[in-house]
Amino acid sequence: MPQSNRIILTDVDGVLLEWENHFTKWMLQKSYFDEHGNRYFPHKSIPDQQNKYEMAERFGVTKDEIRKHIREFNRSAWMGTQRPMLESQTWVKLLAAEGWTFIPITSQTSDIPAQQLRKRRLGELYGDKVFTNYLILGTGADKDSALAEFHGTGLYWVEDKPHNAVAGLKYGLKPILIDHAYNRDFEHPEVLRVNNWKDIHQILSGKK
């Protein structure tokens, strides 16, 4: 149980690190060789599906197939080159300087080397002492078990996926949803929607 209320529980992909464009780039360059030794690129993004949360719809493949690709991607060296979400570095570092601690809760992978790569990347971008007590779950796993550890604390919980944001309410947390095209059809009276970490800083500072 946390001893301080100056703790922010936060997702990573789509909140701290840019994931969807990074994954799309990886998918589009993924290639194979046919029986004649010719290289081909089988994956194409579907233009009118790019605002969907479900990646299977974006690429016109089955959910089982896309899950295999995501598992491979999330344990690849590409985890070491994810870019920070726009302007997130400025405001996360400022919050840390003001005494806030961040606990990442991310459904990245159960692969230990890939988890270490994620930790290193977050440290490179935001600082080695900003994050603590990493809770890294299997690829795509529900976060209820991790959130349950903070039941009744009233901590802020930053997410980009509506399902996970609402899950925080079950444990007495204060969900904040980072705005993305794929979650704009979601509304909930107890979930705060923000554009970026600047908005979050204003909320935590009592300015919004």
Where would I find each of the regions flagged by the language model?
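Substrate-recognition element of Asp-dependent hydrolases with the DxDx(T/V) motif
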Residues: 78-84, 88-122
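Acidic, Mg2+-coordinating phosphoryl-transfer loop and its flanking beta/alpha structural elements
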Residues: 158-195
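Short, basic/glycine-rich phosphate-binding loops at helix/coil junctions
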Residues: 58-75, 99-102, 126-129
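Conserved Lys-Pro-Asp/Glu-containing loop-to-beta segment of HAD-superfamily phosphomonoesterases
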Residues: 142-168
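Short acidic-hydrophobic, aromatic-tinged amphipathic segments that line or gate anion-handling sites
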Residues: 134-139, 191-199
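Conserved acidic residues
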Residues: 6, 132, 155, 191
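Active-site neighborhood of HAD-like aspartate-dependent phosphohydrolases
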Residues: 1-63
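A short, structured active-site edge motif that brings together acidic residues
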Residues: 103-110, 119, 125-143
